Amino acid sequence: MKHYEVEILDAKTREKLCFLDKVEPQATIAEIKNLFTKTHPQWYPARQSLRLDPKGKSLKDEDVLQKLPVGTTATLYFRDLGAQISWVTVFLTEYAGPLFIYLLFYFRVPFIYGRKYDFTSSRHTVVHLACICHSFHYIKRLLETLFVHRFSHGTMPLRNIFKNCTYYWGFAAWMAYYINHPLYTPPTYGAQQVKLALAIFVICQLGNFSIHMALRDLRPAGSKTRKIPYPTRNPFTWLFLLVSCPNYTYEVGSWIGFAIMTQCLPVALFSLVGFTQMTIWAKGKHRSYLKEFRDYPPLRMPIIPFLL
């Protein structure tokens, strides 16, 4: 059997970092990363980006050496991705924060609203309902992270956790401060507005969960397989007929419902910022589907049926 020689160079300086002799032709990039780690333990596999060109795209872990456009002596270029952290850890951290931060304002712990309001309770029903909805949303997210989601990438850059937590925790504190404030004013149209908003919130939360379950069933555990998602017997998944990322559609709908329920400006701004970011993600996933699958349904839009 013909073996390969693999030299790994620094993508910036072109310095030779490692030379691997007698590498099996069937070796994957993941296996080469493991071999590289033996000579450079500080660069564990998740930190490594190996590519054929210094400015090219990173090779996938499942790429096989003999199927790459290289000779028997392959030259790969290395870039350090920096310290990594697991997606699960990031999600648990960024979702647990809003849950507990909101409750601090709801229970009016000392030093927030003034001594005479410490541990007092709001007289408005909508305030208590908002706390239930907000808590339910993030408890759902935490449970989905632990038991539902299957991640195609195991890690992300450590710096992202600070950015993500600033966003989620900051907005949670901002909206909680006003919703639970002793001078908070209930919605203009009273109980009718709250009931309508609650219905929107509940429907969208059920829809979001249904989509996450449908996406989970598409990918076997431990696999990176990608398939076209289609509607199932669950009516909430029928939105797949019109959009590529209905989980984002339902998520935005949930926050719109919460904004209507509380009639609170910070919630409306959080909904707008979230919609903007999710639209960017949805467009990216939509493009990936179109590029990967020739038979991808042409009627679908990224996030809003017929529009966007």
Swiss-Prot record:
One of its GO terms (cellular component) is endoplasmic reticulum. It catalyses: a very-long-chain 2,3-saturated fatty acyl-CoA + NADP(+) = a very-long-chain (2E)-enoyl-CoA + NADPH + H(+); octadecanoyl-CoA + NADP(+) = (2E)-octadecenoyl-CoA + NADPH + H(+); (2E,7Z,10Z,13Z,16Z)-docosapentaenoyl-CoA + NADPH + H(+) = (7Z,10Z,13Z,16Z)-docosatetraenoyl-CoA + NADP(+); (2E,7Z,10Z,13Z,16Z,19Z)-docosahexaenoyl-CoA + NADPH + H(+) = (7Z,10Z,13Z,16Z,19Z)-docosapentaenoyl-CoA + NADP(+). It comes from the Eukaryota. One of its GO terms (molecular function) is very-long-chain enoyl-CoA reductase activity. The keyword Metal-binding does not apply. It is found in: Endoplasmic reticulum membrane. It is a multi-pass membrane protein. Residues 107-124, 181-189, 263-264 are lumenal. Keywords: Acetylation, Endoplasmic reticulum, Fatty acid biosynthesis, Fatty acid metabolism, Lipid biosynthesis, Lipid metabolism, Membrane, NADP, Oxidoreductase, Phosphoprotein, Sphingolipid metabolism, Steroid biosynthesis, Transmembrane, Transmembrane helix. Its EC number is 1.3.1.93. The modification Phosphoserine is found at S58. Glycosylated. Belongs to the steroid 5-alpha reductase family. This is Very-long-chain enoyl-CoA reductase. It comes from Bos taurus. The gene is TECR.
